[in-house]
């Protein structure tokens, strides 16, 4: 194991270029940026924790949701892809029983006393709660983890729908798994992270985000049994045809204050399920749902019913998207992407907040996307939890400049991210 200074020197000399190219691509422009980024993270680690310590460096990717918008938490299907935007963590094991994490862009140093295993008062919705919950998740699985010191630098847009939280969680999890030799596989790490987010952070999330960051590539998941989801990895290479680029646009409105809106989607879907003798919609026979629409409208309200309609139709679409990708039929996949986006807008109703109709960044971005991309073979949709954050578009290369210019006119310079899908999940890089 090398010291932070030794790793900085090795990175600058190009000794880690192959490892970086496997994650981000091998162009000199990309490698130069990542050398600088990793070197800066190592320098910051030294600033906070001192020089001369032996360290390891980890990466956990963000994800883009490709299908299955708000279906995973109802025990349906999910489809997502790991992306090249990621969190990098420099970490060194310690023996004092504390986890310390300093994250770029945040003033506070998270300090977790591992003797305090229970959720702490006032800590929910803060990163410290995730760290504490992940450590306790390992211990509940029989792995006696201890302390470490870490510095993290994330390029995953916070509150944007690319799941910065899952990247952070998986960064912490892969550190503990590696530093303490726990040997847990990627799905097990994802479940620990979900436990931390649900129980300690206080957000009722599904599992797809964590699974995608853990496994990498394009991931199709069947959550009929959420404790042991069936997953299928579709290799990232070849998913996008030549001449088509994945573009994610940040509308620069954050998800960070929208936990209540996300929870309402789940609660309303489950209210419909309860009227049909299920806990979640995945336990409900679709035929019976359609037969009992009048009663469901009366008991649950129209929005809950529309969100249930979205679930059933989106679930079928997600399976069809998976089949299209496996068959290499991007045209069919793109048509399904558009239908998914319309369903999220019209039925799931998570494109803007009804309580704040003046602020509709996602709606505006989708409207402009449709005006540019309709009939071109491209596609567009909102992604992630919704209400704010990012939209996703598959843009023909001939239209990239026009498309990005239109988005930047609305949301400012640098709002468009041209992404690649990433084959590797959370991993120790060096």
What are the language-model segments listed below?
Residues 1-63, 88, 92-124, 220-381, ...:
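C-terminal nucleotide
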Residues 100-102, 147-154, 184-195, 334-339, ...:
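Beta-strand segments within the central parallel beta-sheet cores of soluble alpha/beta enzyme folds
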Residues 77-96, 215:
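Structural signature of FAD isoalloxazine-binding scaffolds in flavoprotein oxidoreductases
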Residues 135-157:
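Glycine- and acidic-rich phosphate- and metal-coordinating loops
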Residues 53-54, 70-77, 116-124, 154-162, ...:
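A short glycine/serine-rich beta->alpha loop
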Residues 160-248, 430:
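Fold-level recognition of mixed alpha/beta catalytic cores in primary-metabolism enzymes, strongest
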Residues 140-148, 176-192, 397-410:
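Phosphate-handling active-site elements
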Residues 59-75, 155-172, 376-394:
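Glycine/serine-rich anion-binding loops at beta->alpha junctions
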């Amino acid at each position: 194991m090398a010291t932070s200074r030794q790793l900085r020197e090795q990175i600058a000399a190009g000794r880690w270029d192959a490892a970086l190219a496997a994650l981000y691509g091998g162009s000199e422009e990309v490698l130069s940026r990542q050398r600088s980024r990793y070197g800066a993270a190592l320098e910051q680690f030294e600033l906070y924790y001192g020089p001369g310590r032996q360290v390891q460096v980890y990466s956990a990717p963000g994800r883009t949701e490709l299908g299955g918008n708000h279906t995973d938490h109802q025990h349906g299907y999910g489809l997502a892809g790991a992306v090249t935007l990621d969190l990098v963590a420099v970490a060194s094991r310690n023996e004092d029983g504390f986890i310390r994490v300093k994250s770029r862009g945040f003033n506070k140093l998270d300090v977790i006393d591992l003797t305090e295993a229970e959720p702490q008062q006032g800590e929910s919705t803060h990163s410290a709660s995730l760290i504490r919950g992940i450590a306790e998740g390992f211990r509940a699985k029989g792995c006696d983890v201890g302390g470490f010191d870490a510095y993290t630098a994330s390029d995953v847009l916070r509150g944007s729908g690319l799941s910065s939280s899952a990247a952070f969680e998986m960064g912490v999890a892969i550190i503990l798994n590696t530093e303490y030799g726990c040997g847990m596989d990627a799905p097990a790490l994802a479940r620990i992270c979900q436990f931390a987010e649900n129980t300690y952070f206080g957000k009722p999330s599904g599992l797809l985000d964590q699974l995608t960051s853990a496994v990498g590539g394009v991931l199709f998941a069947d959550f009929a049994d959420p404790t042991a989801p069936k997953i299928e990895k579709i290799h990232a290479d070849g998913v996008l045809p030549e001449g088509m680029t994945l573009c994610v646009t940040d509308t620069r409105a954050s998800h960070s204050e929208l936990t209540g809106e996300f929870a309402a989607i789940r609660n309303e879907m489950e209210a419909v399920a309860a009227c049909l003798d299920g806990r979640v919609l995945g336990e409900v026979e679709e035929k019976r749902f359609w037969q009992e629409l009048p009663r469901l409208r009366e008991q649950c309200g129209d929005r809950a019913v529309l969100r249930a309609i979205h679930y059933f139709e989106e679930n079928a679409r997600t399976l069809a998207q998976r089949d299209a990708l496996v068959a290499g039929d991007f045209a069919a996949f793109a048509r399904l992407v558009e239908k998914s986006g319309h369903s999220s807008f019209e039925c799931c109703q998570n494109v803007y907040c009804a309580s704040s109709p003046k602020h509709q960044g996602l709606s505006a971005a989708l409207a402009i996307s449709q005006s540019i991309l309709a009939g071109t073979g491209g596609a567009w949709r909102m992604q992630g939890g919704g209400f704010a954050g990012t939209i996703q578009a598959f843009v023909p290369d001939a239209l990239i400049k026009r498309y990005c210019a239109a988005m930047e006119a609305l949301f400012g310079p640098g709002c468009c991210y041209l992404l690649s899908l990433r084959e590797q999940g959370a991993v120790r890089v060096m």
